Amino acid sequence: GKPSPQGSGNGWSGWYKEWYFRSLRELSYMINVINKNSLDWKPGEGSVRIKYTFFDGTERNYSPDFIIGNKMIEIKPKKLQATPLVQLKAKAASEYCLNNQMEFELIDPQILTDDEIFELYSKKEIKFLDRYEKKFLERYNKP
């Protein structure tokens, strides 16, 4: 993989039920939108690979975060949505969607509160990868 842009990813990865999440935003979207509305979905990775041409002319692949019905969903904070790389991928995804009767959405979901995260963790509904587990326990100062 390539290095992420400055400020991307808020440092939390793990599992919610059997679903892998790569950020608090993805986790929040899984819980507040997908789970709450019982939506049928699949991860974009492994389902869709969209070719795009990088700034240096090399061809790369992009996979969205979620596929929900005919919608392709990418989760990004507002502050990163206008960055050149996100725009490049969004353009490729939009063209792909146009040719495949799909819609592309770039979404910045409302993030779960600290209390909601801690409750999910306490009920063992979420499990962080080891390095994030340590960070989580330090942040919440819980044994």
Name the predicted role of every residue range.
Residues G1-P143:
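Electrostatic, structured charged patches in enzyme active sites and in nucleic-acid/phosphate-binding
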